[in-house]
Amino acid sequence: MRDKIQQIREKALAEIDKADGLEKLNDVRAAILGKKGELTAVLKGMKDVAPDERPKVGQWVNETREAVEKLLDEKVKKFEAEALKRKYESEKIDVTMPAKRSKKGNLHPVTQVKDQLSEIFTSMGFEVYEGTEIENDYYNFTALNTPKDHPARDMQDTFYLSPEFLLRTQTSAGQIHVMEAKKPPIKVVSPGKVFRSDDDATHSPMFTQMEGLVVDKGITLCDLKGMLDQLVKKMFGKNVTTRLRPSYFPFTEPSVEVDVSCFQCHGKGCSLCKGTGWIEVLGAGVVNKKVLEGCGIDTNEYSGFAFGIGLERIAMLKYGINNIKLLFESDLRVLDQIDDN
């Protein structure tokens, strides 16, 4: 019996030694130590061994099992270490290789226009005021010479949150807050999002506006025209000129629409200016006396002008975008082409 156990031991150790992988080791383990393994068969045959020999046979079997298991464990650890080393080698990062360059991001076209306009206006001495998007009906309409029964309220489809509060339809509401908080002279621009129930190729339910207000002694429409001339030259080029057309806004009198000479065809007529040679860019006017008086400003001493610029409109003109929805779709194929830097 001892010779048989010794043969099993030598055979197992030899096969373990020449095994070339974990799969082969598992085969050896099953063949020697498994339920149907050779060493297990010896234990099952103990009933045929003389009683006085059984302790010795059991000892030989246990010694063989321990030797086989020890060598198996050592070989398994060796193969696992080699596999881990190969994995590390395959995944190793060569730190000397050039890295992939990060893609340069651009500011959104509307943000670029907002920053450009803010820089132009601050260079002219304007302060920047940030208003609130949820506004009181009084500041959005009533204080701007548009009381509840005024037909001019129908000029804008408004998102009401309650009978008293709404999503502001114009940054003009910021004028009232500023005039209530400050005494003239006042020179301020107020950029921000506004909300109207509009949705087509040139309008969006949410868009960005920049309101401007100047209040001081002796302010006239001529001052407005001079400021606008400087603005468009800095924004669109020194050869661009402006013209004023009569219009109507309840909070200015007189009111004007401001056009710029087409910077694409230079007045000859093209698709951008629809053959007219002029492009509408903003609305403006002399602040209505009722608006000033409502804020406690003496209209015998002070006057002012105001203007409102749609930033998406300027971005579309400046960057040749023909549909306002492209500014809200986050399409990198469009946005990657626009970078003033």
Swiss-Prot record:
Annotated Mg(2+) binding sites: 253
Cofactor(s), names only, from the UniProt record:
Mg(2+)
Q: What is its EC number?
A: 6.1.1.20
**Which EC class, in a word?**
ligase
As for subcellular location, the record says: Cytoplasm
Q: Tell me yes or no: is ATP-binding among this UniProt entry's keywords.
A: yes
A single GO BP:
phenylalanyl-tRNA aminoacylation
Reaction equation(s) it catalyzes: tRNA(Phe) + L-phenylalanine + ATP = L-phenylalanyl-tRNA(Phe) + AMP + diphosphate + H(+)
Instruction: Name the keywords, alphabetized.
Output: Aminoacyl-tRNA synthetase, ATP-binding, Cytoplasm, Ligase, Magnesium, Metal-binding, Nucleotide-binding, Protein biosynthesis
* Assembly mode: Tetramer of two alpha and two beta subunits.
List the PANTHER family hit by this protein, alphabetically: PHENYLALANINE--TRNA LIGASE, MITOCHONDRIAL, PHENYLALANYL-TRNA SYNTHETASE
Specify the protein name.
Phenylalanine--tRNA ligase alpha subunit
Native source species: Agathobacter rectalis (strain ATCC 33656 / DSM 3377 / JCM 17463 / KCTC 5835 / VPI 0990) (Eubacterium rectale)
Question: Which classification does the entry list for the species?
Answer: Bacteria, Bacillati, Bacillota, Clostridia, Lachnospirales
